[in-house]
Swiss-Prot record:
One GO term describing the cellular component: cytoplasm
Protein role: Catalyzes the oxidative phosphorylation of glyceraldehyde 3-phosphate (G3P) to 1,3-bisphosphoglycerate (BPG) using the cofactor NAD. The first reaction step involves the formation of a hemiacetal intermediate between G3P and a cysteine residue, and this hemiacetal intermediate is then oxidized to a thioester, with concomitant reduction of NAD to NADH. The reduced NADH is then exchanged with the second NAD, and the thioester is attacked by a nucleophilic inorganic phosphate to produce BPG.
GO function term, MF aspect, one: NAD binding
Sites where the protein binds NAD(+): 11-12, 34, 78, 120, 315
Pathway linked to the protein: Carbohydrate degradation; glycolysis; pyruvate from D-glyceraldehyde 3-phosphate: step 1/5
Stated name of the protein: Glyceraldehyde-3-phosphate dehydrogenase C
Length: 333
């Protein structure tokens, strides 16, 4: 059984623990580092506005959480290098703060006694894994790995299936993304991004995304071929990605749907639907990406075709299911 520490017990960190318990994983969470008190961490773990009550017992002491009868140490170190991971035997750290998003920064966890780090965010030019797309590139020499973003985990399976079947020449993607904790609840200053200062629950807010760029780290042959941006919208979770691409051959919508359906066969990470679902239907999905065959469109001008494909994703829970799959494989190497 591999022992794991979680750095950052926010939306993703708490769902990591929840999902590990749900799948009865051999991963054992032995320590959590977060600047919030154990009392508040226990409360937020127990009560989740998106996914409902935590199904296991939760209690706390001044320096631990007691989850399903098991004690998990809680630290409150500002600097990763000072976290006593070694004291609890934490071998792999799931980095969920959003601050240690590079190999150089995450090295601090290794210096503190851990053996490996899995970063739950894009982390620059380093090994980046989307499970069932390029997880076969993981090997025993890897010590710090990124699982990219929720949007990359949605886009990558769809882009790979299209590219494998027809070849992608160039494309642009838009994610219609649920608001997140990095946005403002009401209008107010929020760094240098003017639009980020506007109320998340009241506006459609144009936003940046690194998902298209990160595709090149996951599928090297698509490096530089995709561009993308995001529109943040007033939903709590449940997002959708639209990819418009020029392919290497002429296709019909039926051919595209058949190819994508084939790619989802026996694939725990990439799902398929031909039902007319909406964003709330994807909440709690165990897939990182769900292709929507009802939204495939082909627009032709002369010999040029624009091919629109769409995939849904739960940007919190679906992403975490992907993270856990990668974590379990990472732990075995």
């Amino acid at each position: 059984m591999s022992k794991v520490g979680i750095n950052g017990f926010g939306r993703i960190g708490r769902l990591v623990l929840r999902r590990l318990l749900e799948v009865k994983s051999n991963i054992d969470v032995v320590a959590i580092n977060d600047l919030t008190s154990p009392k508040i961490l226990a409360y937020l773990l127990k009560h989740d506005s998106n996914y409902g009550p935590f199904p296991w017992s939760v209690d706390f002491t001044e320096d631990s959480l007691i989850v399903d009868g098991k004690s998990i140490a809680v630290y409150a170190e500002k600097e990763a290098k000072n976290i006593p991971w070694k004291a609890k035997g934490a071998e792999i750290i799931v980095e969920c703060t959003g601050f240690y998003t590079s190999a150089e920064k995450s090295q601090a966890h290794l210096d503190a006694g851990a053996k490996k780090v899995l970063i739950s965010a894009p982390a620059g030019e380093m090994k980046t894994i989307v499970y069932k797309v390029n997880d076969d590139t993981l090997d025993g020499n890897d010590t710090i790995v990124s699982v990219a973003s929720c949007t990359t985990n949605c886009l990558a399976p769809m882009a790979k299936a299209l590219h494998d079947s027809f070849g992608i020449e160039v494309g642009t993607m838009t994610t219609i993304h649920a608001y997140t904790g990095t946005q403002s609840l009401v209008d107010g200053p929020r760094g240098k991004d003017l639009r980020a200062s506007r109320a998340a629950a009241e506006n459609i807010i144009p936003h940046t995304t690194g998902a298209a760029k990160a595709i090149g780290l996951v599928i090297p042959e698509l490096s530089g071929k995709l561009k993308g941006h995001a529109q943040r919208v007033p939903v709590k979770t449940g997002s959708v990605t639209e990819l418009v691409s020029i392919l290497g051959k002429k296709v019909t919508a039926e051919e595209v749907n058949n190819a994508l359906k084939q790619a989802t066969t026996n694939n725990e990470s990439f799902g398929y639907t031909d039902e007319e679902i909406v964003s709330s239907d994807i909440i709690g999905s165990h897939f990182g990406s769900v292709f929507d065959a009802t939204q495939t469109e082909i627009t032709a001008v002369g010999d040029l075709q624009l091919v629109k494909t769409v995939a849904w994703y739960d940007n919190e829970y679906g992403f975490v299911t992907q993270l856990i799959r990668t974590l379990e494989k990472f732990a075995k190497l």
